[in-house]
């Protein structure tokens, strides 16, 4: 099972990472835990919109096993998960390793490592 976490006091972590100084001033909270049908390996880049929603991908899992695109929406009691797309690994692609990018209109864009209509894996 994968978990998406929130790092509290993120600014000090960023500064610490740049200066290579260690500290223990941060804590983490699990904000969502993925089950297999919701996706597996949620270790890709995340994107946020102006409403505070978090978007990302899982490399595997989902309805067809080829990975997913998901949205997490903040609520008063936590985070609500929405499965936006489940890849088949066929012509629609699969294994979206790099997450998504969101444009000004709210459209999501991303790439997949496998599948597609071409004849070679990883793109031609």
Describe each PLM feature range.
Residues 2-124:
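Extracellular beta-propeller repeat domains
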């Amino acid at each position: 099972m994968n978990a998406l976490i929130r790092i509290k006091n993120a600014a000090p972590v960023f500064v610490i990472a740049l200066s290579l100084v260690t500290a223990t001033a941060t804590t983490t909270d699990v904000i969502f835990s993925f089950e297999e049908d919701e996706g597996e390996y949620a270790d890709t880049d995340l994107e946020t919109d102006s409403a505070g929603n978090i978007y990302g991908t899982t490399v595997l899992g989902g309805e067809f096993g080829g990975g997913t695109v998901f949205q997490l929406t903040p609520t008063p009691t936590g985070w609500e998960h929405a499965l936006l797309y489940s890849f088949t690994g066929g012509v629609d692609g699969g294994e979206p390793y790099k997450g998504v990018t969101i444009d000004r209109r709210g459209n999501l864009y991303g790439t997949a490592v496998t599948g597609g209509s071409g004849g070679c894996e990883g793109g031609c």
